[in-house]
Amino acid sequence: MQMVNLTIDGKQIQAPAGSSVLEAARSAGIYIPTLCYHPDLRPEGACRLCMVEASGARTLVASCVYPVSEGMVVKTNTSKVREARKTVLELLLTNHPKDCLCCQKNGDCELQKIAADLGVRKLRFEGGETRARTIDNSNPSLVRDQEKCILCGRCIRVCRDVQGMSVYSFAGRGFNTMVSTAFEHDLLNSACAYCGQCADVCPTGAIVEKDDTDKVWEAINNPEKIVVVQTAPSVRVALGEELGIPAGQVVTGKMVAALRHLGFDKVFDTNFSADLTIMEEGHEFLQRLQNGGVLPMITSCSPGWVNMIELKYPELLPHLSTAKSPQQMFGAVAKTYFAERAGIDPAKIVSVSVMPCTAKKAEAAREEMCASGYRDVDVVITTRELGRMIREAGIDFNALEEAEFDSPLGTGTGAAVIFGTTGGVMEAALRTVAEVVAGKELPKLEYNEVRGMEQTREAVIDVAGVSVKVAVVHTLKSAKMMLERIKAGTADYQFIEVMACPGGCIGGGGQPVPVDASIRQKRREAIFNCDRTSELRKSHENPEIKTLYDTWLGKPLSEKAHSLLHTHYHAQNR
């Protein structure tokens, strides 16, 4: 790699040729404020907050798009630079609501942080026209507030370039410019998968997850209700970030203790139902493979992905596994098997799930998700929402003693916890399918062939003497490319895992912000560490799963299992 030499604020540094001044400065530990820039996205130089002085340039330049050159001298902290940045920021704030104290992004807002960093103490340009307030609260997952939009374009870029959905675009001119959907429809009537990546990258409160914490508090405070909660695999490796703990720390025990302090009657683990999903999905795959079923079979546990295929490729829906997601399987079992064992009227159970994903809110609201006669899951909150509840309750998270999940839905295996990262569902399925086919325990546990962070990975796996070609895909853009290959007949796989979000659930739309590739990698490493240190590492070895089948379901794909744990998907016309 060719390197160039430059000087930033008197510091001699080297940077790769073609990189930006901003990237060079950050690599040297020099802070330059940004709003439109995001490390996961292509830079556009829209906000102008990152302006610097650069030798050879007649005016201040946007460092996020200005390339380094040999011998360049850059100044990031002159009075001219500081005044220009402050002016840009004050102009943005003039057209921005002043409700920071009650905004959902209070404390996580990048605009708020930069205003403090730049020393903005009063606004010199008050009294101008402000953008009309329009709030889109139409769907179960996301809320958009146009008045808080600063036109950074991050949502447009992540939806177009990372997810390939292109739900958002700029519309209008001048002061009337806004981020809009097609024909200015609300998200409920747009081709939105509800993945929440736009909320992850939005620097303000213009796009946020729909806050359902009031529903949870109401249920907890109702003495007539039994409130049970499940926590997804990736929540335990990300929740700490909401509470001042560095990224990549596993906080399972403290999380369980915090949930008890909040008042939940039972604290269960979605890892239990992830193991259950593997039992059902794995046997479904074998049934298709051995009996000439529709192949490739594609996983269906990522609701953002399911929404996308229903919206864009409904003709390929027969490829989807009929197995419900772990969240929905858990809900069905909680209101039947658990209620029966505990002697509780299912009507009194409020089933809450803590998920890394905004699309899970929409999934729980689907008409199909009530096979037991009750909603499988009543309320879904994200990792961010749980963090807010813990802070609201005044819980000192770091001081909590670790606690264990409750039985009988609280035991999970290492195979279940790796659901939280791309390739994890595939690897978990292979661990079980291989031993089912072989009829005996096998020495191989880790399938490194399907690990990695490339957006599309493929491998040929020897499953007890049978060669199975598999693929692993993450991001909706990559998923669309895979579906085009299936349509063209060039995807000669038997089994495909798809996750909607970058990195899988570790990068979900409801996870703590800020997030970038390095943070996702730390969460991913924590997930695999959970697997390596698990006493049980194969789904079919979970004793609570064995008891569930032995005493209640009978066997995988039984009539009762099909009734409660499987579903079918349909085209969405919006």
Where do the protein language model's features map onto the residues?
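Iron-sulfur-associated redox domains of electron-transfer enzymes in respiratory
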Residues: 4-5, 15-85, 93, 209-574
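Fe-S ferredoxin-like electron-transfer domains
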Residues: 48-194, 200, 207-222, 226
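Short strand-loop junctions, especially beta-strand C-caps/beta-turns
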Residues: 9-11, 182-184, 234
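A short alpha-helix capping/helix-coil boundary motif
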Residues: 1-3, 134-136, 176-178, 233-237
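Charged, low-complexity surface patches
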Residues: 14, 138, 148, 191, ...
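Eukaryote-biased recognition of intrinsically disordered, low-complexity regulatory segments
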Residues: 1-11
